[in-house]
Structures are given as C-alpha cells and as structure tokens.
C-alpha cells in the first residue's frame, strides 16, 4: 500500500488479518488503507481480517492494475520501463501536487499545479518535451 502504483495478479488475495491475532495493522496499514479505499471499506477489511480477492481489490482501488496470474512481476517491470521513459522531475511534480492538494479546495490545488508547471518550464523539462513532440521524436530528459 505504500507505493504510488500497485499491480496484482488475478489470483492474488490481499488483507490485513492482524485483528485475528489480537493486533492492529501496523506499518501504516490503519492509515494507508482508508486513504486508498475509503473509511468504510477499510474498516470492513481491518475489523473482520478478511481477505480481498484480486477483482475486488481492483474494484475498490486497492490495486491499480490487474494482470493474469503469474505475470505480476513482469507487468510491474513493464510499468517500470514506462515510468523510466517519462520525465522524472515531471513525475515527482505530479505526485507532489496530488499529495499536497488532495484534500484542499480546488482553487488552491489549481494554484499549486500552476506553480509546478512553471517550475518545469524553468527547469527545461517541459520545453524539451514540447520540442520533441513538435519534432516527432522521443524526448531526451536529463
């Protein structure tokens, strides 16, 4: 749960069974799960200790991509290759902007977003991306 993108195989089963052991989910489970799936669903999973199958995990937002059983590692590697092809500063700005403004008023989030766009133009990342698009070539990000 402590990552930006989550890939699971179709046979995956996920859960936080700690209550069945007299514990609570540690390692941030009580904080991350509600943020991913909502308070009610998170409490259902944590209070019962039940497992969620892959289809339900995708439906409720616990995972972002569902792939055939046995291919999750390969799919995650392919996703990593896709991520490596993009601008790292732009990706950091996306995550930073989403995290900073997620529960803020829309106007505040839009202002913060505009600041991040301006910073990317100042760094040159955005200009290289636009030039590459116009030149019909792959961008060469630093």
Residue ranges of each PLM-predicted region?
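Acidic, divalent-metal-coordinating active-site segment for phosphoryl/phosphodiester hydrolysis
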Residues: 49-56
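Terminal peptide-recognition signature
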Residues: 33, 57, 94, 133
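Hydrophobic alpha-helical segments typical of transmembrane helices
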Residues: 29-32, 41, 90-93, 113-116, ...
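C-terminal long alpha-helix characteristic of the crotonase
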Residues: 7-12, 54, 63-111, 115-124, ...
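Conserved functional loop/turn residues at catalytic and ligand-binding sites
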Residues: 4, 23, 50, 61-62, ...
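CoA-thioester-processing core
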Residues: 1-47, 59-60, 75-79
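Terminal low-complexity tails and localization/encapsulation signals of metabolic enzymes
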Residues: 131-142
């Amino acid at each position: 749960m402590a990552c930006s993108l989550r890939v699971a195989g179709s046979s995956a089963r996920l859960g936080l069974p700690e209550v069945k052991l007299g514990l609570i989910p540690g390692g941030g489970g009580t904080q991350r799960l509600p943020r991913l799936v909502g308070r009610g669903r998170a409490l259902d999973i944590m209070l019962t200790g039940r497992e969620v199958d892959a289809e339900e995990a995708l439906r409720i937002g616990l995972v972002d991509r569902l792939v055939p059983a046995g291919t999750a590692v390969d799919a995650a590697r392919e996703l990593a290759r896709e991520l490596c092809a993009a601008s790292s500063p732009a990706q950091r700005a996306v995550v930073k902007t989403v995290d900073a403004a997620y529960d803020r008023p829309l106007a505040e989030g839009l202002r913060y977003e505009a600041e991040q766009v301006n910073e990317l133009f100042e760094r040159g990342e955005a200009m290289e991306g636009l030039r590459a698009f116009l030149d019909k070539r792959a961008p060469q990000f630093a």
